[in-house]
């Protein structure tokens, strides 16, 4: 099958998913000897337009896992803004070393419904957005190289495949997970459900330079750029503002949220999960 271009798209508030999207784009580009365009689907302005992909393009797409599924506030954007035309796709999710649960299956279902042909998939354990104590060094250089090699092999198989065989392989391709399963319920240190849906970041005004970086990084556009201590919009707890503030001025102090973070650190810092690779070929 002839592929004329590669598109690599990612939702990545804290950067781990983006690293894998770029590594796999490079591997596929080398295998197919064609250009790869890497683009973000993270910020509101990057999700405004509907994106169409043709049958002679390869799409690589990745998202982090939130509570065992795709981020619930971003799921409608994936469903409504991505359109394929029998477009082959390599999909992946990242997760913070607890479990990717049903996120990979959900992403595959969305893409298949929207006209894509899923051919390969992966799940990557990354540094947890909530804590530097969970997989702080991941993705490691060797893991990105491994992902690049995976994409290269998938692209080579795609190049050699007959279109009819390709479509049949895609229809038979499955990944672990249940798209109908509910979201994971976060737990606190005591094992009880931790309810922090309404938690929002606070600002240490003694550190804040009013540079606006936190507002610029927010994937929901929820932080007031004129007064960054004001968060009138929805917070998805992605930590983009916390990690994007070089002064360390953004933080969370919600008791239930912090209890959940401690539970994760106590139970999921080790052992580190292995990355998962799956292929239809």
Spans of model-derived segments:
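Iron-sulfur cluster-binding cysteine motifs and their immediate structural context
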Residues: 203-204, 209-258
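Short, flexible coil/turn micro-motifs enriched in small/turn-prone residues
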Residues: 10-11, 207
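Acidic, Ser/Thr-rich low-complexity intrinsically disordered segments
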Residues: 177-220
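FMN-binding flavodoxin-like domain, especially the glycine-rich phosphate-binding loop
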Residues: 1-8, 14-20, 24-44, 49-193, ...
